[in-house]
Amino acid sequence: AHYDYWDDKVRRSILFDAPADLLVYGMGEAATREIARRLSRKVPPREITDIPGTAYIAPTGEGSGFHPVACPSYEEVCADKTAYARATKIQYDEHDPIRGCAVLQPCQGRVLVVNPPARPLSREALDALYDLPYVREVHPMYREEVPAIEEVRFSITHNRGCFGGCNFCALAFHQGRMVTSRSIESVVREAELLTQDPKFKGYIHDVGGPSANFRHTSCAQQKRRGMCKGRSCLAPEPCRNLDADHSEYTALLQRLRRVDGVKKVFVRSGIRYDYLLQDKNQDFFRELVDYHISGQLKVAPEHCVASVLDYMGKPHFDVFERFWRQYQKLNEKEGKQQYLVPYLMSSHPGCTLEDSVRLAEFLHRTGHQPQQVQDFYPTPGTLSTCMYYTGIDPRDMTPVYVARDPHEKALQRALLQWLSLIHISEPTRLLSIS
């Protein structure tokens, strides 16, 4: 069961509304192949109950191939927001391919069974997936031009998964928190294919993924034990077991720069600056500034107030300021004038009007006017959505302030775009390196 923002109510699982025997969640490649194998052997769909990364409805919840954990029923979470918060915590904790259990939720006389997620694909399997003959065109169903294709047509995905731990982001549910990545050879092969496209002008727009500078799991223990329950790898402080290493990503970008027909290789996906700062070797940071920024680098501090950042699952603002100072120094050393563009979010649970004023003061002090500000909207499954709906932080079951009133949400957002309000015609300024 999940909170639906558009209906402003808790809805039951989509499996109860869709005429389907089985649901595949996550990236789905391994689960889909295994389902196909069993169906080819005439196994009835209702007997396919033990595949990771799948969910199904059962009369009692028995029969899953995984250890079951019960969470509050659909009826309970509809009636009691505390029960909803408890259910969210259970679902989040068990979303792990190694230590996770099957989550059972009774609903209207039947039981939803959500098996643990599938294990990440191996590097070899991920390479094979990206070696398939993609045409890099929009689907034929689209009869008109799709402008967004131009940015992604000549971009390359090199990794999958994210251990960043942002509470408002659903990526952990789609791709998992364990990072896996393609081999350098696989990415280079794709770059060589790009150079054969008549539309290619020599510029690879992005070499990234959910977080561009992740290439491997955050620590060696994850492959044996899974992700730590109830802990984040990066926030509010980096884990002491964090393995911050950009050497392979640096080598990948160096290889791409040497591909015949490639003029420039840019990194436009989100860089996790907190992870970057943990790497004692700063070669990647220097090469990023030297070769891979197309005028401006986008990063996501999201806010400047510590309490708000804690609710978001983000590092504190002093980490961003430290990164900004080092970024300035590297640009000055190389004689470059490149900008830093921070992504910001308004009205996240825990953010008050006073907190937005403090962020507006920072923007005023730095002369920065964001052209775009993300106003928080709840999306199914995330911890932040649970906070929004219940007013409870599911991690520790404590109350959270929530800006639900449309007027206050609009005001919080407007404070971050203060120059627009007073109609100043001075050109928009970025966080300039000058």
Go through the PLM ranges and name each one.
Residues A1-C107, N115, Y401:
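Glycine-rich beta-alpha loop elements in corrinoid/cobalamin-binding modules
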Residues D21, V187, V299, V373:
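Conserved, mostly hydrophobic/aromatic
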Residues I48-A70, R182, T195-G230, T385-I392:
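Terminal amphipathic helices with adjacent charged low-complexity linkers/tails
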Residues A85-S155:
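N-terminal [4Fe-4S]-dependent radical SAM core
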Residues R143-A170, Y203:
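N-terminal pre-triad scaffold of radical SAM enzymes
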Residues L193-V341, M345-P349:
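Conserved SAM/AdoMet-binding glycine-rich loop
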Residues P349-H364:
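Catalytic cores of alpha/beta
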Residues I422-I433:
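Single conserved hydrophobic/aromatic residue that forms the stacking wall/gate
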